[in-house]
């Protein structure tokens, strides 16, 4: 849901989308770029953040709370008033005026951590609300118009019960996966 929203924003603003999926091995070179050989010469292979900055796209920083400090340090100057990237061994580049960055994250997943205040302050935080019975009803009616009322009510009830237990830390957030539930229902349909 979060990444689809980010990609749709890029589409609405008619800007290219550059996706970065953070994981424990993502480093600053992956974001800015690394040296490579082209025709027996060392050239910069531009990273995702570099390309986004250069062409004015939407940088979608997926699971930003899994990023190592090395990777996050690249984002500080990029996201603050300087709006620039220092490319070691090359030049400093200024961000295209249309360049935007959207960080997405899930709380409580393995390998995630709290974001530091300096990074969070560079974003406008949008907390995606939990699903309500009404929103689930809308989704299920659109995706499964032929499902029996009783079955739809039960599926919604199971999801809401799991969501409540996850919110109260009675269970992990892992079982709470609307995408997975919808995929399972498509198989049964």
Where are these regions (language model features)?
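C-terminal helical "lid" subdomain and adjoining coupling/linker elements of P-loop NTPases
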Residues: 165-189
């Amino acid at each position: 849901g979060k990444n689809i929203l980010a990609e749709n924003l890029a589409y609405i603003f008619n800007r290219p989308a550059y996706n970065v999926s953070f994981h424990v091995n993502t480093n600053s070179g992956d974001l800015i770029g690394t040296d490579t050989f082209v025709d027996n010469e060392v050239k910069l292979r531009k990273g995702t953040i570099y390309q986004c900055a250069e062409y004015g796209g939407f940088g979608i920083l997926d699971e930003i709370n899994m990023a190592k400090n090395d990777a996050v340090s690249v984002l500080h100057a990029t996201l603050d008033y300087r709006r620039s990237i220092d490319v070691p061994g090359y030049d400093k580049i200024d961000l295209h005026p249309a360049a935007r960055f959207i960080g997405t994250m899930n709380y409580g997943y393995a390998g995630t951590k709290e974001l530091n205040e300096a990074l969070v302050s560079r974003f406008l935080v949008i907390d995606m609300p939990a699903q309500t019975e009404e929103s689930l009803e809308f989704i299920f009616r659109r995706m499964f118009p032929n499902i029996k009322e009783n079955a739809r009510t039960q599926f919604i009830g199971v999801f809401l019960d799991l969501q409540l237990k996850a919110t109260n830390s009675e269970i992990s957030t892992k079982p709470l996966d609307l995408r997975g539930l919808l995929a399972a229902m498509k198989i049964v349909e």
